[in-house]
Amino acid sequence: MLRFGITGKSGAGKSTVAQLFEKYGVVHVDADKVAHNIYEPGTPCAAEIAAHFGPDVLLPDGSVDRRSLSAIVFSDAAQLEALSAITHRYVGEAISQIEQRERAAGAKGLLIDAIALIESGQKGAAVIAVTAPYEVMLSRIMERDGLSEEEARRRLDAQKEEDFFVSHADHVIVNNGDAGALEQQVDAIARKLGLCQ
């Protein structure tokens, strides 16, 4: 089973690209969704986050308040690093379990979709970076996450520069909003990775 990764800034279109790869029998693992699960009440990760950031980052049910935590980490690079140090281990363990399950089920490939793909060590056999114009990413995350422009800018600016993702990538996809061009780029990479003829 081929394991590969997709990365890029928030709002670049990683999930859209990952969905296009699914037609090749690839299972899409969204690290953000995995993180949602490890933030649930009573999980060791939620407890460790509360121990580091304080009880105010927990909701009454004991789950991690992602909005509250985001306000802290996207305004302080050291706090973002601390959160990454806590979560990468738990996300990595969860992804390993998913990989074992999907391998046993006969999946053709596993595509890990993560902003912190490089730093977390989850990249696999190949890395695909997705890029998009800054203003496009800004508008996408404002709409998707219900953020103000200031919050969205702070989030984007707290992330690695686009050059970081591109320099660590084996393949680069430019997502300027043209669905046909996006699909052509995915198809070309799928051929290079041996997912199709």
Task: Give, region by region, the residue ranges found by the protein language model.
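The conserved Walker
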Residues: S10
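Small-molecule kinase domains that catalyze NTP-dependent phosphoryl transfer to phosphate-bearing small molecules
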Residues: I95, K123, E143, L147-K192
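Walker A/P-loop
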Residues: S15
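Hydrophobic anchor at the beta1->P-loop junction of P-loop NTPases
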Residues: I6
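ATP-dependent small-molecule kinase phosphotransfer cores
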Residues: K33-A107
